[in-house]
């Protein structure tokens, strides 16, 4: 057809590399990048999938809700611990081409710990957070992605990496709305 003749491009599939179908200009750009860059597979990094809560509406909260939880803390010590527990979070859709647009969302990081290194979060030490999560009890009690208790997030072997710098990809492909948060 005329369209194929006008738009067709040659792709060499004889090598052992993955198939990449690009226009001639895109192939040229790819070759230039590969000539000066280090392939991601050769970097000394680990790639993870992010946080799975099993119930985002309970564990991912707005700034307003965070402030409400902090205001409900009974002591200054509880407030300080709670501030450290509730961490800012970026979702895949918050990542833009050259930066990010933070949606002012926070993760209640009631993690399950890392055996032998980091203890599990005991919800009893965070009464204001527990009161918030209790509002979602029917949803959090039976979720598959949970830790030792329904209040804990699932086991995460790379918990220590959450406070390190990251490379974040903006397109997360998932059919499950409770997954895919970097």
Regions found by a protein language model. Name each.
Residues 2-182:
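Polybasic, glycine- and aromatic-enriched phosphate-binding surface used to engage nucleic acids
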């Amino acid at each position: 057809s005329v369209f194929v003749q006008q738009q067709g491009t040659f792709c060499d599939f004889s090598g052992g590399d993955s198939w990449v179908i690009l226009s001639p200009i895109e192939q040229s750009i790819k070759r230039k990048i590969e000539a000066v860059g280090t392939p991601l597979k050769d970097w000394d990094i680990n790639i993870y999938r992010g946080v799975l809560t099993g119930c985002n509406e309970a564990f991912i909260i707005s700034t307003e809700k965070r402030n409400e939880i902090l205001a409900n803390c009974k002591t200054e010590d509880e407030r300080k611990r709670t501030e450290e527990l509730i961490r800012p979070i970026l979702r895949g859709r918050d990542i833009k081409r050259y930066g990010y647009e933070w949606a002012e969302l926070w993760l209640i990081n009631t993690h399950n710990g890392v055996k032998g290194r980091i203890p599990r979060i005991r919800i009893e030490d965070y009464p204001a957070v527990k009161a918030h999560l209790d509002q979602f009890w029917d949803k959090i009690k039976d979720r598959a992605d949970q830790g030792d208790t329904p209040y804990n997030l699932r086991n995460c072997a790379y918990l220590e990496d959450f406070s390190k710098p990251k490379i974040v990809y903006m397109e997360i492909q998932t059919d499950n709305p409770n997954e895919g948060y970097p």
